[in-house]
Amino acid sequence: YLDVMAAMLNAGADVNARLTKSLWYTTYNRDLLGVDRAGATAFWRAAYALDIDAMRLLLAHGADPHRPTLKVPGRNRAANPDPSDLAPVPLGGPAVSPLLAASGVGYGQGDAGNSHRHVPDGWLPAVRFLVEELGADVHFRDHNGYNAIHHAAARGDDAVILYLVGRGVDVTQMSRRGQTTVD
């Protein structure tokens, strides 16, 4: 797959092209993970797969390692108050960063962990790569108010949680649904 990626990039593929919508043939995985990939780039998808080799290849061709997915229209949750005190994210605004993808966005829902393919034991190495080598913002909050610790905690990943706490991420940050990682 890396050879195919390199060939496409060498032939002029736009390394920072964004998906304009979720792809119909990925709906099974999207439905279980609850992650809309509209706005995702190849780099974001490599981060989501914990694939450092693919991330390095994309970076060598000019990939932007900080480009998040984009917020799309969601369910009307007007009846549910937002206790987070976060500013609203407009449609088309930033949704899920590559760091949040690599920390496990979507894994706290249903049986998602059984459906997603990623590099075995790649969680902490991918998170460290994004933070230490690429300067990913460990304090980034997604459009739902979650940070990387929320996603790592949803998977029960103590190593990533401790790493992020060591980088200063606050475990008491509240999502738009009122959830913290210490509840």
Language-model segments: residues:
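Ankyrin repeat A-helix N-terminal signature
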Residues: 1, 28-38, 45-51, 78-80, ...
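Solvent-exposed, polar/charged alpha-helical surfaces in well-ordered, non-transmembrane soluble domains
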Residues: 3-6, 44, 53-56, 100, ...
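Leucine-rich solenoid repeat scaffolds
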Residues: 171-183
